[in-house]
């Protein structure tokens, strides 16, 4: 009888350890899902760590026309940078597998070092890395078209 009670006790201890592991794994999975959900729904502000006066030039390639242009005018650079900085973006969908784009835009400091680069697809969409980011409109897409006409002619 003692042998049977010992086996039952060992079995109960094994089951208790198994339950602890299951609870621990479940908690870790829940925390990861919660963290990813919070991260996904957080707003993003592009160029938020950069002072507009530190950006000295912008290079743009129009994926629709194949034209590229650069501009260094302080007011134009400031307008584009401040416009992008003032727009809160939210992650939308994965950008994997999508082809083509509007404006590929790169920002450079006074030494010609690239600070940031991403794609502006429309007045409400930025594409960077794995995601499309959306806002309620207001990105300087039309202004970039005007600059393209000015600098490509």
Task: Set out the residue ranges of the language-model regions.
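Function-determining sites in protein domains
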Residues: 11-14, 18-153
